[in-house]
């Protein structure tokens, strides 16, 4: 099962809790990239990524309450501003690029809408969304259709986070980062998010 993903990037100073070289570390995404930059850097258009699956790197995933295998670290050095900070009702925040799209609850509980960050407003609820669920999981998932993509999506119990505030902020960096994990989830600065697109 794959995840509907955030298509934007995460600010390099956001932190991740992870295990590497037998140590639990809490470091920024930029520091993790620099730590792993001794490995070959691959290119995919303007994005760069490092395959870390063989490095025994594990990233914390609060949904599964475990450190899960990290497969890739992705850097987009040409990712342009603006940056936005989202504040949630549990006081957690995350800084992401304006290209980020989020699944949010629609008018019907069985539907969701995908919105770019500059279309979000206070009171909307971010939801976890999967696609391609197995037939034997029907009791756990609720089918919805989304005419925009002509794909059947399902809302899950991954998470719901109410947005309190979306703030456009000025950041000096023009690079963003993403991770790919085995579970498709990881925590950034205390916020559980869906990972980058699987390659």
Where are these regions (language model features)?
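Autoprocessing domains of the Hint superfamily
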Residues: 1-199
């Amino acid at each position: 099962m794959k995840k509907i993903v955030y298509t934007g990037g995460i600010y390099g100073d956001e932190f991740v809790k992870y295990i590497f070289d037998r140590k639990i570390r809490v470091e920024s995404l930029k520091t993790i990239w620099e730590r792993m930059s001794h490995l070959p850097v691959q290119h995919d258009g303007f994005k760069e990524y490092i395959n870390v699956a063989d490095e025994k790197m594990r990233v914390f995933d609060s949904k599964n309450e475990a450190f899960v295998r990290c497969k890739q670290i992705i850097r987009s050095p040409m990712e342009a501003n603006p940056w936005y900070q989202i504040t949630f009702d549990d006081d957690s925040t995350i800084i992401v690029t304006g290209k980020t799209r989020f699944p949010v609850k629609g008018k019907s509980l069985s539907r969701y809408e995908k919105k770019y960050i500059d279309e979000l407003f206070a009171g909307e609820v971010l939801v976890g969304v999967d696609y391609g669920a197995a037939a034997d999981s029907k009791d756990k998932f609720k089918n919805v259709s989304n005419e925009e993509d002509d794909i059947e999506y399902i809302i899950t119990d991954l998470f719901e986070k109410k947005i309190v505030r979306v703030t456009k902020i000025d950041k000096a960096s023009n690079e963003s980062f993403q991770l790919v994990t085995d579970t498709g989830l990881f925590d950034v600065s205390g916020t559980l998010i869906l990972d980058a697109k699987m390659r």
